[in-house]
C-alpha cells in the first residue's frame, strides 16, 4: 500500500478531470514529500469503515492505467521531439551568430574599401582638374608660341622680301651703270662662293586646291618669300594669267580692263544695276482701252517672267488727273525707271509734255523706250507728237515705235510682244534667238558656278550698299583718315586689324566706301574685299553667309574649282587657309573691309580668325560703334572718328542748302551752329538730316517753323521722329496717313525689307500715286533706301524712330503686321509661286513668331527648301529644322516621304524634270549633312527620272552622274565614282564639245579622284587639260559675281559710249572689247576694239601708247581668228609705237615682242623671229638682271628656235646658261632644271651623242620622280610642249619650252 503520491512521477502533470473547464495543469514538485497525516486525511469521506480491503479502494486508478501508459508514451515522444527541436534551434542560433559575426566583419571590410575608393576618386577628380588646368595652360602657351612664331616668320619673310627687293634694285642700278660704260666690279665673276644665293622657288603652276586638304598644308614659310622674290613674266600671277584663246592679249590690258569693269559696275545709275524691271507708263484718254487690257492681261505675265529670273516687275503709272501734279515725284520715277511706255493716239496732251521731254528727249543713258502709236483713219498726228517722234528716234536708236490701227486687244498684245523682247534682251540679258534658250541658259548658269552654291542677291545687296554708302559728296576732314588708312597699308607686317570706331552716324561707312574708291583708282593691283553689314538679324548680318561670301571671293582668284562645304562651321576653318593661300599667289595687297562688324551675331565667336596674325600682304579694317565694340578688340590699333567741328558743320550745312537752292539767314545759321555742338548733335548724320529736313521744308516756306522744331531734338532718333511727323502732316487725308504708318511698320517687322509691288498687295486701296509720293519724301529725307529692289531703312536710327513712333503696342502690334506679311506670302505659295522672297521671309517670320508647326509645314514645301538650299542658305535651313526639333535622320525621312507623295501627281516632261531637280537637291542636301548613304537613293532616283523622261545622253543626266559620283567618292567607293565621272565626261563632251566648262568640271573631279588614289601622274594630266579649257573659256568660276551681273548690263555699258569722243569713252570701248573677247564673242569684240582704236586716234593721236594697246588687242583677236596676216601687220605697228613711246624694258613692249615672235614662228618666218627672241632676252636682262629665272626662260625659248632652225651649236650654250641660272636661283632639283635637262638630252641625241643624252635624260627623270614623291598631289607641272610657244621633236625625247 502507499499514498496517491506514489502514482505520480517527479515532474509529471496531473490533469484536472473533474472540472468544469477552468482547470489548469498542475505540476507537483516531488522534492517535498507530503506528510502521511495529510495524505490520509485527504481521502476521508465521512466515518471510517473498519475492515474494508485495499483492492476495493484502488480499483478506480487501475482502470485508467492503459490510458495513462498511452499518454505517457505520447508525451515521451513529444518531449523527445521538442528536445531535438530545441537542440537544433540552438545549433542554428550558434550558426547564425557565427554568420552574423562573419557578415559584420565583411561589412567592416567593405566600408573600409569604400572609404579607400572614395578617397581615390576624390584624388582622381582633383588630378583631372589639375590636368585640365595644365592642358589649358599648355594650349594657351602653345597658341602664344604659335602666334609668336608666325609673327617671327612673317617678319622675317618681310625682311627677306625687302632684302631681295634691294638686291634687285642694286642689280638694276648696276646694269644701268654698265650700260653707260662705267666699269664696275662684278661679284658674280669672282671665284668665291660667298656671293651665291641659293633660293628655292615653288613651281609657278596653278595648284589644284581642294577644300578637304586646306587644313593639311605645310607652313607657308619660304613660299611667301620666294613667290614674291622673282618678278618676271612667268612669275607674275595675274588675276587672269592664262594661255589659250586670248593669251595674246597684253596681260596688263586685260587686267586693267577687267578690274575697271568690275569696279565701275556699282557706280552706274540705279536703273542699270537694280534687279527691278520698273516700267513707267504714260497714256492719253484715247488709248485707255489698250492700257486697261495691257494691265489686266499682260502685266501679270511679265511679272511672272521676271520673278522666274529673280527680278521684281513694277508697272508705275499716275492717273490722268494727277499728271499735272507731283512733277518732282514723276521726274524721279522716270529717272529710276528702266523702261518708259507711252500710249498715244494722234496728239500729245500738254499734261504729258514735261514727262515726255524728261523720258524721251533727256534720255542720256539711252534706256529703252516704247511708244504705242494708235493710228486712226482720217486723223493726222499733231505737230508736237511729230516733233517728239522725229527728235527722239533720230537722237538715239533706243526708242521703238509700235504703230497699230484696229482692235485694242490686238494692239495691247502687239505692245506686249515688243516689251517682252526688250525686257529679255536689254534688261535681263536673255538670248531669245534660240528656241532652246531657256534650257541652255539654265545650263550655262550651272556651268558658271559649278558645284558652288551662292546667292546673286547677296552680292547685289553688297554692291548696292557700297554704291549708296559712297553717294555722299561730303568728305569733310576725311583726308587725315585717308592718310592713316594708307599708312596701315604701307606699314610693315604683321599687324593686327585696324579698328575704326565712332558713334552712330559718325560717317564710318562713308569713310570706308570713299577710301575703297581711292584705292581702286590709285592701286588697281590691290584686291579689295568688302562687306557692309546691315541691320541686326538681316541676311547681311548672318555670319555664315558673310564668311562664305568672302571665301568665294578668295576662290574666284584661283583657276581651280573646289567643292566648298556647306557646313557653316567649316567656313571658319577654311577661310584663313584660303586667305593665306591667295596671299602667296597674289602680287598686290589684299584688303578686307567689314563695316559695322558689331552688328554680326556673336561676332567674336564667328570672327576668331581676326585674332591670329595675318599674312604679310593682307590688311583687315573693321568698323564698330564705340558702345558695342567687343572688349577683346579694343586693344587693336584704333582710328576714332572725331565729332564735326563748327567749321565742318557750317560747311556741310552750306553744301546741302546750296545744292537745293535754299538760302538760310545768318541768324538761322548761327542757331544751327550753336545747336550742333553736343556729342549727339555734331555727328555727320544728324547735321545732314537736319539740313535735308530744312531744304525739304524750304519748298513750303516753313523753314523757320521746322528749324524751331529741329532745335528741340537732341539726338538723331528724335530728329527722325520729327521727320515722320512732318511727312505725315503733308499727307492730304487720314487714309494716306494710315498708309504711311502701315508701310513703315511692314518694313520694320520684315526680314530684309518689302518691295513696292508687295506693298501694293499688302495695303488694299493703295495707289501708285500715294506710294511713290510717300517714298519720294522719305527717300529724300534719308529715311528709306532701295536694296535689291526692297525698301529698307537707311540707318538704324530711322528704324528705332519708326519703332518708337508707331510700334508702341509692343509684341502684339509686331505680331499683327508679321501675320499680314505671312498671309501674303502664304497666298503666293498656295498658287505655286515660290520666289526667293517668299522663301526668305516666310521661314524667318515663322521663326520669329515661334510658330514651329507652321514653320515645319513651310519647310515641307519642297520648292521652298530647294530655293533656300540652291541659293546657299544652308545654315539658315539647318537652323530652322533644329528649331522645329528634327534631327538629320528625321529631316531625310520627311523629305523622302514628301517627295514620294509629290511624285504620285507628276505627269508630263516638265513635272518630271522638276521632280528630278528636287531629288537631286535632296541628295546634295543630305550629302552636305554628312548622310552619304541616305544621299545615294535620291540621286539615283534623279538619274533614273532624267534618263527616262529626257534622254540617256541629255546633259542633265551628266549632272546627276556627277553628283552621284561625288557621293561615292566621299564614301571612298572610288571604283563606282570613277565609272560615273567618266560617263558624265563622255556625255558632256558629246553635248557641248571637248572645250566646254562642263567638260573641265568633270576633268577636275576625276583629277581629285585620282589624287585620292595616289595616282598623281594621271591627276596632273587631267588638271592640265582642265586648266587649258578654263583658260580658253575665260568665264572663270571666280568671276561669277562680276561677270554674271556685268553680262546682263553690257548693253547699257555700250550706250554710255555713244556720246562725244573722249579718252574715257575710248577706254570703256576697249574694256568692253576685252570683255567680249574673254567670252569668245570675237565679232562683237572686234567691233568695240575698232571703235576704241578709231576714237583714240582722233582724241590722242595715232602714235599714242593707248592706241598701241587697242592695236595689240586687235592683233590678238585676229590671231585667235587665225587671220595671221592681219595680226602680223597690227603687231608690227604696235611694236613700232611702243618702241618709240616706251622705255626699252617696259612690260608692254616685252609682251608685244613675245607675241609677234610667236606669230613669226607659227608662220615659219624663223629668221624674223630670231631678233625678237634675242630682244626678249635683252629686255629681261635689263628688267630683272642677268641671273633671273625669266632670263633663263627667254634663253630656253631662243634655244628651241635655234634647234628648229637646225642650229644646235648656237642652241647648246643657251641651254647651258639657262640651266646654270635655274640651278643657281631655283635649286638643282627644280622642275625647270629637269625640263632644261630634257631639252639638252634631245639636242645631244640629235648630235649623235647618245651616251650623254641618256645621262642627261636619266638626271631629268630623277628630278621628276623626286618632285612627284615629295609634293604628291601638288606636283608641279612639267610644262608640256603643247601650246603656242612649243617645239617638239618627233622622237623619244620631246623638247619643252616655258611660257613667257
Curated annotation (Swiss-Prot):
Keyword Repeat: yes
Protein name: Nephrocystin-3
Phenotype upon loss of function: Bilateral morpholino knockdown of the protein in the embryo causes gross body edema that is typical of a renal excretory defect.
Coiled coil: 82-183
InterPro entries reported for this sequence: NPHP3-like_N, NPHP3_ab_dom, NPHP3_hel, P-loop_NTPase, TPR-like_helical_dom_sf, TPR_NPHP3, TPR_rpt
Region Disordered, residue ranges: 1268-1288
Keyword list, A-Z: Cell projection, Cilium, Coiled coil, Repeat, TPR repeat, Wnt signaling pathway
Any one of the GO BP annotations: Wnt signaling pathway
Organismal lineage: Eukaryota, Metazoa, Chordata, Craniata, Vertebrata
UniProt feature, compositional bias: Polar residues: 1278-1288
GO CC, any one term: ciliary base
Role noted for this protein: Required for normal ciliary development and function. Inhibits disheveled-1-induced canonical Wnt-signaling activity and may also play a role in the control of non-canonical Wnt signaling that regulates planar cell polarity. Probably acts as a molecular switch between different Wnt signaling pathways. Required for proper convergent extension cell movements.
Subcellular location as annotated: Cell projection, Cilium
Source superkingdom: Eukaryota
Pfam families membership: NPHP3, NPHP3_hel, NPHP3_N, TPR_12, TPR_7, TPR_NPHP3
Predominant subcellular localization, coarse grouping: other
Amino acid at each position: 500500500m502507499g499514498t496517491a503520491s506514489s502514482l505520480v512521477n517527479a515532474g509529471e502533470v496531473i490533469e484536472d478531470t473533474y472540472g468544469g473547464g477552468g482547470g489548469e495543469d498542475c505540476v507537483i514538485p516531488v522534492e517535498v514529500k507530503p506528510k502521511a497525516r495529510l495524505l490520509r486525511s485527504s481521502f476521508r469521506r465521512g466515518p471510517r469503515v473498519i475492515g474494508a480491503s485495499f483492492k476495493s479502494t484502488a480499483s478506480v486508478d487501475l482502470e485508467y492505467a492503459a490510458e495513462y501508459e498511452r499518454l505517457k508514451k505520447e508525451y515521451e515522444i513529444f518531449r523527445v521531439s521538442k528536445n531535438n527541436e530545441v537542440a537544433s534551434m540552438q545549433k542554428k542560433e550558434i550558426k547564425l551568430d557565427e554568420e552574423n559575426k562573419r557578415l559584420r566583419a565583411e561589412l567592416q571590410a567593405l566600408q573600409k574599401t569604400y572609404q579607400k575608393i572614395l578617397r581615390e576618386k576624390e584624388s582622381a577628380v582633383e588630378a583631372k582638374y589639375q590636368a585640365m588646368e595644365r592642358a589649358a595652360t599648355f594650349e594657351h602657351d602653345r597658341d602664344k608660341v604659335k602666334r609668336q612664331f608666325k609673327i617671327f616668320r612673317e617678319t622675317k619673310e618681310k625682311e627677306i622680301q625687302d632684302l631681295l627687293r634691294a638686291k634687285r634694285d642694286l642689280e638694276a642700278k648696276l646694269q644701268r651703270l654698265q650700260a653707260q660704260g662705267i666699269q664696275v666690279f662684278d661679284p658674280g665673276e669672282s671665284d668665291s662662293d660667298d656671293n651665291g644665293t641659293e633660293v628655292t622657288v615653288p613651281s609657278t603652276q596653278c595648284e589644284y586646291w581642294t577644300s578637304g586638304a586646306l587644313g593639311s598644308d605645310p607652313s607657308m614659310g619660304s613660299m611667301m618669300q620666294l613667290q614674291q622674290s622673282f618678278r618676271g613674266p612667268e612669275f607674275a600671277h595675274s588675276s587672269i594669267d592664262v594661255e589659250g584663246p586670248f593669251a595674246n592679249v597684253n596681260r596688263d590690258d586685260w587686267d586693267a580692263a577687267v578690274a575697271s569693269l568690275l569696279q565701275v559696275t556699282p557706280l552706274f545709275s540705279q536703273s542699270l544695276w537694280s534687279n527691278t524691271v520698273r516700267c513707267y507708263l504714260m497714256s492719253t484718254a484715247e488709248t485707255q482701252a489698250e492700257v486697261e487690257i495691257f494691265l489686266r492681261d499682260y502685266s501679270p505675265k511679265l511679272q511672272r517672267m521676271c520673278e522666274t529670273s529673280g527680278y521684281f516687275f513694277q508697272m508705275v503709272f499716275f492717273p490722268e488727273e494727277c499728271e499735272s501734279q507731283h512733277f518732282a515725284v514723276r521726274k524721279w520715277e522716270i529717272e529710276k525707271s528702266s523702261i518708259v511706255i507711252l500710249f498715244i493716239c494722234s496728239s500729245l496732251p500738254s499734261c504729258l509734255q514735261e514727262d515726255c521731254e524728261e523720258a524721251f528727249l533727256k534720255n542720256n543713258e539711252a534706256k529703252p523706250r516704247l511708244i504705242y502709236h494708235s493710228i486712226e483713219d482720217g486723223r493726222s498726228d499733231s505737230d508736237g507728237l511729230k516733233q517728239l517722234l522725229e527728235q527722239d528716234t533720230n537722237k538715239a536708236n533706243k526708242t521703238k515705235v509700235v504703230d497699230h490701227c484696229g482692235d485694242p486687244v490686238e494692239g495691247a498684245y502687239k505692245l506686249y510682244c515688243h516689251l517682252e523682247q526688250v525686257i529679255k534682251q536689254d534688261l535681263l540679258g536673255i538670248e531669245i534667238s534660240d528656241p532652246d534658250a531657256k534650257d541652255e541658259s539654265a545650263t550655262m548658269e550651272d556651268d558658271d558656278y559649278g558645284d558652288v552654291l551662292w546667292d546673286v542677291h547677296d552680292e547685289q545687296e553688297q554692291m548696292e550698299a557700297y554704291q549708296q554708302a559712297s553717294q555722299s559728296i561730303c568728305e569733310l576732314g576725311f583726308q587725315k583718315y585717308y592718310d592713316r588708312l594708307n599708312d596701315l597699308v604701307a606699314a610693315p607686317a604683321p599687324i593686327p586689324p585696324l579698328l575704326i570706331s565712332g558713334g552712330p552716324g559718325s560717317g564710318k561707312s562713308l569713310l570706308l566706301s570713299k577710301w575703297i574708291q581711292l584705292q581702286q583708282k590709285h592701286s588697281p593691283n590691290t584686291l579689295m574685299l568688302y562687306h557692309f553689314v546691315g541691320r541686326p538679324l538681316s541676311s547681311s548680318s548672318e555670319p555664315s553667309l558673310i564668311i562664305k561670301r568672302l571665301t568665294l571671293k578668295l576662290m574666284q582668284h584661283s583657276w581651280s574649282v573646289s567643292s566648298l562645304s556647306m557646313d557653316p562651321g567649316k567656313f571658319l576653318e577654311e577661310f584663313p587657309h584660303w586667305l593665306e593661300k591667295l596671299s602667296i599667289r597674289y602680287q598686290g595687297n589684299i584688303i578686307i573691309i567689314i563695316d559695322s562688324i558689331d552688328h554680326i551675331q556673336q561676332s567674336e565667336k564667328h570672327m576668331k580668325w581676326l585674332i591670329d596674325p595675318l599674312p604679310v600682304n593682307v590688311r583687315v579694317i573693321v568698323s564698330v560703334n564705340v558702345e558695342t565694340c567687343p572688349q577683346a578688340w579694343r586693344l587693336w590699333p584704333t582710328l576714332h572718328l572725331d565729332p564735326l567741328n563748327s567749321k565742318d558743320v557750317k560747311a556741310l550745312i552750306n553744301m546741302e542748302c546750296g545744292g537745293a537752292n535754299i538760302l538760310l539767314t545768318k541768324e538761322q545759321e548761327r542757331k544751327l551752329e550753336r545747336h550742333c555742338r553736343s556729342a549727339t548733335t555734331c555727328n555727320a548724320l544728324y547735321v545732314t538730316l537736319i539740313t535735308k529736313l530744312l531744304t525739304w521744308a524750304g519748298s513750303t516756306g516753313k523753314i523757320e517753323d521746322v528749324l524751331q522744331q529741329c532745335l528741340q531734338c537732341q539726338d538723331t532718333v528724335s530728329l527722325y521722329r520729327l521727320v515722320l511727323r512732318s511727312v505725315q502732316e503733308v499727307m492730304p487725308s487720314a487714309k494716306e496717313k494710315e498708309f504711311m504708318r502701315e508701310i513703315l511698320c511692314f518694313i520694320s517687322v520684315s526680314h530684309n525689307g518689302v518691295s513696292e509691288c508687295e506693298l501694293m498687295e499688302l495695303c488694299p486701296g493703295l495707289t501708285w500715286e500715294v506710294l511713290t509720293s510717300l517714298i519720294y519724301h522719305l527717300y529724300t529725307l534719308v529715311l528709306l533706301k532701295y536694296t535689291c529692289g526692297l525698301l529698307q531703312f537707311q540707318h538704324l536710327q530711322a528704324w528705332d524712330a519708326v519703332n518708337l513712333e508707331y510700334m508702341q503696342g509692343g509684341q502684339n502690334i509686331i505680331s499683327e503686321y508679321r501675320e499680314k506679311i505671312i498671309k501674303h506670302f502664304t497666298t503666293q505659295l498656295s498658287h505655286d509661286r515660290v520666289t526667293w522672297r517668299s522663301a526668305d521671309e516666310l521661314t524667318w517670320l515663322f521663326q520669329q513668331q515661334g510658330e514651329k508647326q507652321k514653320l515645319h509645314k513651310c519647310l515641307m514645301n519642297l520648292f521652298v527648301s530647294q530655293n533656300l538650299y540652291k541659293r546657299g542658305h544652308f545654315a539658315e535651313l539647318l537652323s530652322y529644322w533644329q528649331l522645329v526639333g528634327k534631327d538629320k535622320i528625321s529631316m531625310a525621312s520627311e523629305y523622302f516621304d514628301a517627295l514620294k507623295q509629290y511624285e504620285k501627281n507628276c505627269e508630263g516632261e516638265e513635272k518630271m524634270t522638276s521632280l528630278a531637280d528636287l531629288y537631286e537637291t535632296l541628295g546634295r542636301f543630305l550629302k552636305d549633312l554628312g548622310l552619304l548613304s541616305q544621299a545615294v537613293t535620291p540621286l539615283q532616283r534623279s538619274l533614273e527620272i532624267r534618263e527616262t523622261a529626257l534622254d540617256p545622253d541629255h546633259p542633265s543626266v551628266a549632272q546627276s552622274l556627277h553628283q552621284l559620283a561625288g557621293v561615292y567618292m566621299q564614301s571612298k567607293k572610288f571604283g563606282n565614282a570613277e565609272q560615273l565621272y567618266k560617263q558624265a565626261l563622255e556625255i558632256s563632251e558629246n553635248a557641248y564639245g571637248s572645250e566646254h566648262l562642263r567638260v573641265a568640271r568633270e576633268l577636275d573631279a576625276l583629277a581629285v579622284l585620282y589624287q585620292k588614289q595616289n595616282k598623281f601622274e594621271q591627276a596632273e594630266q587631267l588638271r592640265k587639260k582642265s586648266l587649258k579649257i578654263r583658260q580658253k573659256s575665260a568665264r572663270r568660276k571666280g568671276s561669277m559675281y562680276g561677270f554674271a551681273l556685268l553680262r546682263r548690263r553690257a548693253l547699257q555699258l555700250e550706250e554710255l559710249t555713244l556720246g562725244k569722243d573722249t579718252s574715257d569713252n575710248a577706254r570703256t570701248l576697249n574694256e568692253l572689247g576685252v570683255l567680249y573677247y574673254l567670252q569668245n564673242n570675237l565679232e562683237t569684240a572686234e567691233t568695240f576694239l575698232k571703235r576704241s582704236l578709231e576714237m583714240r586716234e582722233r582724241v590722242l593721236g595715232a602714235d599714242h601708247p593707248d592706241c598701241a594697246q587697242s592695236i595689240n588687242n586687235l592683233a590678238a583677236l585676229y590671231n585667235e581668228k587665225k587671220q595671221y596676216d592681219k595680226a602680223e601687220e597690227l603687231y608690227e605697228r604696235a611694236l613700232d609705237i611702243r618702241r618709240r613711246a616706251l622705255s626699252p624694258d617696259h612690260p608692254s613692249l616685252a609682251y608685244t615682242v613675245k607675241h609677234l615672235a610667236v606669230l613669226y614662228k607659227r608662220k615659219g618666218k624663223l629668221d624674223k623671229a630670231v631678233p625678237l627672241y634675242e630682244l626678249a632676252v635683252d629686255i629681261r636682262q635689263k628688267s630683272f638682271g642677268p641671273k633671273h629665272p625669266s632670263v633663263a626662260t627667254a634663253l630656253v625659248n631662243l634655244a628651241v628656235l635655234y634647234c628648229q632652225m637646225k642650229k644646235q651649236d648656237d642652241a647648246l650654250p643657251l641651254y647651258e646658261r639657262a640651266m646654270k641660272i635655274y640651278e643657281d636661283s631655283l635649286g638643282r632639283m627644280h622642275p625647270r632644271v629637269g625640263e632644261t635637262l630634257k631639252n639638252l638630252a634631245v639636242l645631244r641625241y640629235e648630235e649623235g651623242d647618245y651616251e650623254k643624252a641618256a645621262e642627261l635624260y636619266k638626271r631629268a627623270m630623277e628630278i621628276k620622280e623626286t618632285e612627284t614623291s615629295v609634293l604628291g598631289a601638288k606636283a608641279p607641272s612639267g610644262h608640256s610642249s603643247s601650246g603656242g610657244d612649243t617645239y617638239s621633236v618627233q622622237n623619244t625625247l620631246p623638247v619643252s619650252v616655258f611660257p613667257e
